[in-house]
Amino acid sequence: EYRAFYDKKRGYLIDNRKYPYSITFNSLLPEFVSWWLFDKPILTSEMVVKTLDKVPVKNGYSPLIFHEKDTFFTMENKPFSPNMFWDNGIYYNAGSWMREEVCGYVAGLKHGWKDAKKRIKDRLAVEITLHPDEPFSHEFLPYDLSVSGCWWPSTRVFSWNVFVLRALEVAGMRSPLQD
């Protein structure tokens, strides 16, 4: 059962029990989908709000997945396959993924999380403004801009992020008439 992934002691949803120190927006996607398709929650507001309260935010955006204490993973504590690792703030090592982040915030909004609308608006703005030479959507945004090579070449179109339009409709922040 989905609710069983909430750890009361830690105060957040556990995405993978093998790595309980890992917090990710992915754990909130089923909650978002339930609001989208059925207009009702699966989780309690406490579960959603406490999970979102653990999410770090810097310059208007947050990492997709992060270590509960250190934000970034190390080779010793990573929740990835043995041969996979990325530098701090890159890709799955605390990179920021707009679609998952916004869907998580929408779940929070539906549960009355006070920071939701601001976080959604900030994240949308950061997607376009963080890299002035690339004012378009990216697969992910690096969370540590000091890392050499943190900006991967972009395809200039990242269609998964179009899903954010649907998420904004679920949030009541846009209407299909705006298309």
Where are the regions a protein language model picked out?
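Internal, well-ordered domain-core segments that constitute the primary functional module
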Residues: E1-F5
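C-terminal capping/lid segments that line or modulate ligand- or cofactor-binding pockets
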Residues: Y6-E46, M84-W86, I90-D179
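Short, surface-exposed beta-strand/loop "edge" segments at domain boundaries and coil↔beta transitions
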Residues: P20-Y21, G60, T74
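Carboxylate/His-rich catalytic cores and anion/metal-binding grooves
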Residues: I42-K58
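Charge-rich, low-complexity amphipathic helices
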Residues: P56-V57, D70-N77, V126-L130
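Active-site rim segments in enzyme catalytic domains, especially the processed small/beta chain
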Residues: K58-L64
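Generic long, charged, amphipathic alpha-helical segments
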Residues: L64-G89, N93-W97
